[in-house]
Amino acid sequence: MLCEIECRALSTAHTRLIHDFEPRDALTYLEGKNIFTEDHSELISKMSTRLERIANFLRIYRRQASELGPLIDFFNYNNQSHLADFLEDYIDFAINEPDLLRPVVIAPQFSRQMLDRKLLLGNVPKQMTCYIREYHVDRVIKKLDEMCDLDSFFLFLHGRAGSGKSVIASQALSKSDQLIGINYDSIVWLKDSGTAPKSTFDLFTDILLMLKSEDDLLNFPSVEHVTSVVLKRMICNALIDRPNTLFVFDDVVQEETIRWAQELRLRCLVTTRDVEISNAASQTCEFIEVTSLEIDECYDFLEAYGMPMPVGEKEEDVLNKTIELSSGNPATLMMFFKSCEPKTFEKMAQLNNKLESRGLVGVECITPYSYKSLAMALQRCVEVLSDEDRSALAFAVVMPPGVDIPVKLWSCVIPVDICSNEEEQLDDEVADRLKRLSKRGALLSGKRMPVLTFKIDHIIHMFLKHVVDAQTIANGISILEQRLLEIGNNNVSVPERHIPSHFQKFRRSSASEMYPKTTEETVIRPEDFPKFMQLHQKFYDSLKNFACC
């Protein structure tokens, strides 16, 4: 029979055992220790609920065992070290430092270890620990903390492919001791990525499985011929036992996932490349954009993974070239690092040349990222675009990367189908098309500085350059040359057209105010539009040679 202190330890641990202990798992182990008999095991196994099995297990163990050692050994053997540590610390503090028992053992230590167990049971992936984007991680924690009292909500974590959305979500859930276990009772993390109509049904079938307790897994019903209405009803019933669960839908592509989650009134953290899927939600929505790494972050990122820092101007130029070509994309930088063997700047310079000559497939390797190359991930983004948006993206290849370009110049090459010759309507249609590309995968980025401009990053341009056929590139250059010539012949120095109504708040009273002459101005002025290709002659000469090869 256990002594009083050990009996109290088991009583204190009862709540924890309810969360994370199945007595059936321990029966065979303890039979081998001659603590339980076959009759004891049969009695416990026949209990219909886990709560009954736990209660009878503890009742028998208190009377049959002489110490907690065998049970502690089982918890270590069963990868439940947080339970073993709790019992050991309880006994130690209860005997040697009883005043510290509650604050030291019962509260903080167990909550952290229980969090790890909850993350494991919730299918939350283990992510990198050597580098954390503190700003983004803390924003996710803050938003989830602020929204925890809402009946249902969506927090959208959106950004370009390979920007680290899933990593940030996982790091936020692992970093905070308050989110899982206090603000939210439990968590369910599932990868979506589906594009087929049946994908949503399969995803929520997995949710039903995750919501079921271990008691029900062996009796999990077949859903092969179940309708979506019945499946939703089954999930609602399962949510009665898991009312305060945070759901993480990773890499959502279809808005149908959002519609299902809204019908079920779930609390959701969603990672996606397409922020437009949020339009399907009518509940409370919050957004966090995951941008590319800044230059100093790129240095820290590579240094955290063991890349030596540059010594001298030549090595610094090589590293800056890598950062420029990757556009600060974490997944691409990771591929650079994994491919850079030995870790020298000579090898990195070779990879830069390979990337420029062969495109993103030139740096292809296995990393923690889901794809071997970013080209595969971007291709998947393109596949879900409409034909009109794909066509617009293809012609974006004739624009120089890293340059903020006014919509007027984009209108020279982006194909749109309108029945009017009005320049204002044309520019509005082109602006809408480019905005969609900036929302659906961050394929472009837009600014108002103070006119509306759009920019294509180096990494997106490099991708397009090697997937768009040469004839389309040649046609785009030819069309741009012709349109710029027409603009020059019309002597358009100051646009006379009206600014669209939805841009009115950015309107200036004169052209000189619209395009202020400051040393920081980087946007091409209207009178320089005809000279656009001359200003970027090196780029266009290179692109023409590439299209001719």
UniProtKB/Swiss-Prot annotation:
InterPro entries xrefs: CARD, CED4_WHD, DEATH-like_dom_sf, NB-ARC, P-loop_NTPase, WH-like_DNA-bd_sf, WH_DNA-bd_sf
Any GO BP: defense response to Gram-negative bacterium
CARD domain ranges (all copies): 1-91
Presence of the UniProt keyword Nucleotide-binding in the record: yes
Resulting phenotype, I258N: In n1948; no effect on the interaction with mac-1
One example GO MF annotation: BH1 domain binding
Main location as per UniProt: mitochondrion
Residues annotated for ATP binding in this entry: Y131, G162, G164, K165, S166, V167, R273, T367, Y369
Gene ablation phenotype (knockout): Mutants exhibit a block in almost all programmed cell deaths that normally occur during development. RNAi-mediated knockdown causes a defect in egg laying in a small proportion of animals. Also causes a moderate increase in CEP neuron survival in response to high Al(3+) levels. In an ain-1 mutant background, enhances the proportion of animals arrested at the larval stage, with egg-laying defects and with a ruptured vulva.
Impact upon substituting V230D: Loss of dimerization without affecting interaction with ced-9, loss of ced-3 activation and severe reduction in the number of cell corpses in embryos in a ced-1 mutant background
Keyword RNA-binding among record annotations: no
GO CC list: caspase complex; cytosol; membrane; mitochondrion; nucleus; perinuclear region of cytoplasm; protein-containing complex
Localization of this protein: Mitochondrion; Cytoplasm, Perinuclear region
Sorted UniProt keywords: Apoptosis, ATP-binding, Cytoplasm, Magnesium, Metal-binding, Mitochondrion, Nucleotide-binding
Coiled coil region boundaries: none
Residue numbers binding Mg(2+): S166
Residue intervals of the NB-ARC domain: 133-417
Outcome of mutating A394W: Reduced interaction with ced-3
Subunit structure: Associates as an asymmetric homodimer with ced-9. Only one ced-4 molecule within the dimer interacts directly with ced-9. Upon release from ced-9, forms a multimer, known as the apoptosome, and interacts with ced-3; the interaction results in ced-3 autoproteolytic cleavage and activation. Multiple oligomeric states of the apoptosome are observed including hexamers, heptamers and octamers. The hexamers likely represent a pre-mature state of the apoptosome and may contribute to the regulation of ced-3 activation.
Function in brief: Component of the egl-1, ced-9, ced-4 and ced-3 apoptotic signaling cascade required for the initiation of programmed cell death in cells fated to die during embryonic and postembryonic development. During oogenesis, required for germline apoptosis downstream of ced-9 and upstream of ced-3 but independently of egl-1. May regulate germline apoptosis in response to DNA damage, probably downstream of let-60/ras and mpk-1 pathway. Regulates CEP neuron apoptosis in response to high Al(3+) levels.
Protein name: Cell death protein 4
Protein's organism: Caenorhabditis elegans
